[in-house]
Each structure stands twice: as structure tokens, then as C-alpha cells.
Amino acid sequence: MKYLLRNIIIILIVVAGVNIFTEKMSEKKKGEANPGTSEDAPTSSFITDATSFEAADEEDEELDADAYSSRDWTSLMAMPTDEQIYSVKGLGRSPYIALYMHFPGVRRAMEYCADFHADHQPKGTYLCPFNWWMDVSSLKEQYTSVYNDYTGTPGGYCGFQRLGDGSRVFIMTVWTTFCEDSDGNVTVFTPKVVYPENKGEANRTNAEGSFVQCILPYDWRAGRDYRVLIQQTNAADTGNVVLTSWVYDMTNHRWDELVSFDTGIRDIYMYSCGGFLENFLTEYTGEVRTMELSNMQARSADTGEWVAADYIQFTVNGSLTKLGYIGSCNFDTDGASLWAITSGVSGLCETPSDEEPYYLEEGVTGDPY
């Protein structure tokens, strides 16, 4: 009887311990799975470590037909043959499609959100959902000149690349801000990557002025859906604006915090958001690239409300670097989404006009978390 009682007590203790552990893990998963609003965003101390993500260098796995977009790409652009693709290898870059998202009534934003999908993402593909400027009005009250030495206006961008070795990465860049006073003295605000630690690299290339950039493995896959969120918060100790990128994998139902930048500046806000689809390796210029964006929303810094984009302004080959572009492209809006397709092979379709806005149907707005 004594031994039976002891065993019962042991079992009860074990069960209680398991229940407590399960509750703790449940709480942790809830925190990890949700970025929260910009007011109560969790700290990165319990978010999946971005450095643990694995890049894939193997060839794309064959996905089920229903994994891909229902869009008939062959009706939007003729598919190039292998011979055509080979014939333009190294001759230039396929068309650079940039886009501006208009959010009615949003003067300044604390968050941007969009869902993206790529059926075709060959090597040398850069799909950028967000490219934004910063409203630095507060600095202009203190200095006679506030600028960035590349675009003129401070800002940043983030997106997803397929590298030449086949690996897939996430990239986020924030430009350095220069402030000059009436005596000609220049104060420099250099952004810093605060998560993950020691991952930022300053001025990695000479092509885009002064900036800090973070590149991390992220295995974004063709035919899958993702949601990307750029969130602005204030550092608890300094009040500096912190810009954080999150990605939601809709296949695995998981939010991941990827990168956080401390801008070193207070009281600035994001505005004028856009994106682009780019081919950055001429060896793969003839390959087909596609991009689809939907659920494009901005959270107003003035009202706190989420607002859906109402039109898109496309631009063809408008890159500041003015590289040599060749080939075909097509783009349009469809309901509350947009799409674009490119190839370095010419004559596959007619290029649409980029002079007029492309309107979107009214999208669903609200908490994207």
C-alpha cells in the first residue's frame, strides 16, 4: 500500500509538471507567432533566431499544381524557349518593374503590410515588397539640410533574393542620414542592426551611397504565399525609431522576426511606400520572373487605422543606376492585387503604359497579425 501511494504521488507530480510546461510553451508560441501592434511588439529575446534559418541551394522541388497561382502567365506573356533564353545570356538585365502604392489619407505610416507570391523565381531574382522614405520633418526643424547621399531622401527597403548559387535570402537596407547646420557642421546618423546581433554591414557596395545592410538566409519558395510586415517602434532606452521586418509563412503558419534596425533618430516616420521586381544577374536575364502582391495596407501614424492601397503607379526601367535593360514585361492590377512578369527576351508581349495609375478594388483592412 505504501509503495502504491508513493507511485500515485509521483504520477500526480509528473502530470502537474507536464501541464505547467505545456502552458508555458503555449504562452511562448503565442508570443512567437504574433508580432503584435507597433505599440506592444514583443522583444526579440523570445523570437525565432534569424541566424538559424537555412538557405536552400538545391533545385526547386516539384510542387502540386494547386500550390501555384491560378493566374495563367502564358496568356500574359509568351514563354521564351531555351534557345531564346540562352541567346540573351549576359547581354543585359530584364526589365526593372518598380511600383508605388497609394494609401488614401495616410501621410505618415507606422506599419506596412503586404502578401506576396512568386511562381517564377530563377537565380538573379529580387522581389522587393517594400521600399520607403522617411519623414524627417523633426530633423529639418533643427538643421538647414537633411539628406541621404544616394537618393537625397533617407529611407530603406527590404525584400527577397535568389542568388547565383541557388540560395535564397532576405535583405534589408536602411540609409544613413546626414544633417548639416547653418555653420556647415554635419551630424551623421548611421543605422545599426540590433537584431540579430553583429549582422549589419555598412556600405557593402559603392552603388547606393551610405547605408547599413543585413542579409540573412530565408528559404522563400516558388508557389508559396508569404506576408511581410515592416513595423516601426521606439527603443525603450533612447526613444530612437526602430524598424523591424517580420515575415509570415502561410504554409507553415509561422511569424518570424528577421531584422531590426535602430535608426539612431527620434520622431521620424515612414511614408511613400513602393516595391520592385528586379533581375540582378545578367547570366539569367532571359528567365521568366513573376511577382504578385495583395493585402497591401498601411497603418497611419496619425490615426492608428489600417488603410488599403487604392491604386498602383508602375514604372519601367526607372532604376537610379540606369543599367542596361532588355526584354519583355507585362503588369496590371487585378481586383485588390497586382502582378508583374518579365524576361530578358524581347517580343514576348506588348509593354503596358506606365503613365497612368492602375486602380485596385477596395481591399480588406484590419489587423494583419
Give short role names for the model-derived ranges:
Residues 1-10:
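N-terminal Sec-pathway targeting helices
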Residues 14-66, 71, 78:
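Bacterial Sec-dependent N-terminal signal peptides
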Residues 73-106, 119-123, 285-369:
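Activation corresponds to long, low-complexity, non-globular regions
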Residues 84-193:
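Secretory/extracellular carbohydrate-interaction modules
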Residues 85, 252-263, 309:
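Local beta-strand/beta-hairpin segments that build beta-sheet-rich folds
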Residues 160-229, 233:
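Short N-terminal edge-element motif at the start of the domain
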Residues 220-256:
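Carbohydrate-binding surfaces in secreted/extracellular proteins
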Residues 263-287:
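Flexible glycan-contacting loops in extracellular carbohydrate-active proteins
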